[in-house]
């Protein structure tokens, strides 16, 4: 009996499968039509740009801003700003500034293009709806032909931070982002976190800024006002930098370096403020709004009078000789101030960091780009070139107390000591190679050379494998490191460490590391959603903001402990010298019993252009062995198979 029922069941299963197959075959054309329609909806709603996206990268295909705007009332007197809807996959987001009343928003869109429904209720354009940032809502866009696209809508809001809204002439960032040097005029509105208007002014230029940062989707920008403006209480100026911090998942490394320098120096230090930035209504992310390192009244005051900073260009011709580039102006006055920036790699590609109009000179330690005067004459550039060669020669020969005393009449020792301390702790891979500034005061202000201000430390503080190490001076060695060989300079570094760095760490820096993450957290959440699939992080980044912040705090404490041992000479360190047949050599220091890291070996190979490292007896150096004494490693151009 049981066998009979089994046969009946199998017959029924086969019949069901047969009829399902027939049903699919009969309806396959209509199902394909539905699939095509769904694709058409996605294509039409996402806009024509989607056709030009990389079809193999789903994140790029699906991420875009739609012409749907949210408007929330302000807590203060600032004009209400509309923000665009951002969609990624089947998720949609409105990123609201901190000053808004976010419990309700008005939605605006083109009703001739499609209808918008939230929780199955049609929302006419201009209608106010209640929202909760903790909730998600079903949103449907329906075109006139009935095709639909469905999303899960979330409303996110920042807090504690000011918001900056920039509108460009073409209402798009495409042209600006296409190439460095492209720019558009525009308008900027800055609103503080309580809804008050901080700045409302015309922009002469919005353009890209930086070099390495150009390779990531979240760009760094420079904005130039038509007239000087005081932005976020940092003093009136024409030029401002919006640092994206795209390489830094903590968002805090640049600000940490700037605050360290500000707290320890009596010279000029960059001011900066975190803000949420919107371009043409599109949320661009969390940015660090910074003073540009330049000569100016509220910057580094190097001119005889304020009018010199805004004087029209003479449009002189750019001339170039073997080791200098200058303008054919006839200015023979060399007594003014100078601002220079290191561009230390003496290879042709290094010039790619500068435009054809940028002046430079080559000294013993490398190439320096001229930041002031704007159009430097041959007389002036020859003067500052000779001056820097003299300084470098004095530093190289600074051994005795008398050498130190004479050098102190030429350079500001404290600023050099402070920069040494910051580079020691930050351990930035670009230290002394790029973005390292020096300025020489005019003769009527004493004429001394100052180190600083520090700039661009987002790849420091453990953000690359090369600087996650206990090695000292495992980066480019500059003037400060060369000067550290003098015992009297070491004494000054030690004094400043105790007089300024230790108290600063116990108060301002510790508070910064503990309190800033809370201030940034909601803004960072929005930034992470906006750029989640496009962030180009470095070797030692963690997956989330909280973990990266914890690591930054840990790394800072570890490097501060190493600095204490090194400066106070309480720890045992050994010098490892790297040398090549041509006679060039570099060195770093390793704590007793620690490893000479692979990243330092790789860095030295790249720096000295060698293939392998060998000991004095010719044996190949075996990585991974602890260092217990001074040693010399010899480089070879031979490539180790």
Predicted features by range, described:
Residues 216, 365-433, 439-441, 446-579:
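Middle-to-C-terminal accessory/interaction subdomains
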Residues 182-244, 377-383:
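Conserved oxyanion/phosphate-binding beta-strand-loop segments in alpha/beta enzyme cores
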